[in-house]
Amino acid sequence: MNLLSLLLILLGIILGVVVGYIVARNLLHQKQVQARQTADDIVSYANKEADNIKKEKLLEAKEENQILKEQAENELRERRGELQRQETRLLQKEENLDRKSDLLDKKDEILEQKESKLEERQQQVDAKESSVQTLIMKHEQELERISGLTQEEAVKEQLQRVEEELSQDIAILVKEKEKEAKEKVDKTAKELLATTVQRLAAEHTTESTVSVVNLPNDEMKGRIIGREGRNIRTLETLTGIDLIIDDTPEAVILSGFDPIRREIARTALVNLVSDGRIHPGRIEDMVEKARKEVDDIIRDAGEQATFEINVHNMHPDLVKILGRLNYRTSYGQNVLKHSIEVAHLSGMLAAELGEDVTLAKRAGLLHDVGKAIDHEVEGSHVEIGVELAKKYNENNIIINAIHSHHGDVEPTSIISILVAAADALSAARPGARKETLENYIRRLERLETLSESYDGVEKAFAIQAGREIRVVVSPEEIDDLKSYRLARDIKNQIEEELQYPGHIKVTVVRETRAIEYAK
């Protein structure tokens, strides 16, 4: 290899290195440009994403702020509405008081005017009476002067003349009255017989306000109470009956003034003890089952009463209402047994007097039917009984017997008189009634009725012998704040309207349940 070839090779290598360097530099520059462009794109995209996220967060914050604002406005609007309603009620009460005050003022003015007029009339009457006495004295003196007779002689002569003139009229009147008396003798005899009857021998048991459920062992008491008392609390809330668990061995006492509720509670507790499964869900099932059993017992009692009295073709609903009387007492006297007794007495009296025996028995059996629902419907038991008899198409004589047996209206038939007499005899029989128990029950019924008169109250139970009223409210209508207000209102009304010994505890129960079924 010569020198020229080496130079050419060396030159080629140098050219290759230079060209490679230039190419590599250009490639590096292009990559730098591309990398810078990519970085700019990434930064731009990141900025856009950041802007989008920022906008979304701002929108979410604005929406949340708007929701909170609307909620606050709604709450404020509700409070303002409540305040306006309270203000309206206060204004109405103030207007009513003003109207009553005006009426009282007007009545006072009218009374004063009447008193003034009466005084004027009294003065006028006194003046006229004095004038009349003066005239009488003048006439008497003039008559004595003209006739030459004294006052006593003139009066005696006048009486003799009047006696002679009336003697014939008196004789005629006596004959007419004798004839009229003979025509009415049958009716008069029947009415007299209706007041003189013998008492019917019947057995009554004074109803108590407690029932006792026997237990297999004392361990069952703990199961009835349940964890933290939830079982006993559930049973008391569902039935309205107090469960008294004390040192009495193998026994639980049920206390309540309503015999139907007490029987439902007793039946449910007996079934729970027999079943052995005692928890709130099972208690609800057993109480509902017990209600159906007691309904059947009530219906059977009504049918048995109609069978015993031999009364037929009575509406089934009326028979069931009649059966409810087996769980009602009047002054300690079982109302259904009292009604059966009145029916027997009325039937025997009707037979003696020749009246319709079947109709008299039917009237006697139904005379107190209004007492079966008088704690559920407004009005006296007489008014309710009349409405029931009309509703179920009973005879007009029976309707009048119900309406008149306490003297609210005049009796229109002998049967009505007989029913009233039989009712009085049954009630007056020694040992038939007890005043104290009836007054106690009426007080508890009044306590429950007063509590149930408020809106949103589903039911109310007087427990602890009337020392506590437990009020169950609808959670949709009564919230927590209104619950406190309701308890205070009931407390104030009890203090104003009722008389009672000691204190009465007002408990408002508000419960919300959410139930779903997994399939």
UniProtKB/Swiss-Prot annotation:
Residues 209-269 form the KH domain. GO terms for biological process: mRNA catabolic process. It holds the Pfam family HD. Keywords: Cell membrane, Endonuclease, Hydrolase, Membrane, Nuclease, RNA-binding, Transmembrane, Transmembrane helix, Virulence. Residues 335-428 form the HD domain. Its main location: membrane. Gene3D superfamilies: Hypothetical protein af1432, K Homology domain, type 1. The chain crosses the membrane at residues 3-23. This is Ribonuclease Y. It comes from Staphylococcus epidermidis (strain ATCC 35984 / DSM 28319 / BCRC 17069 / CCUG 31568 / BM 3577 / RP62A).
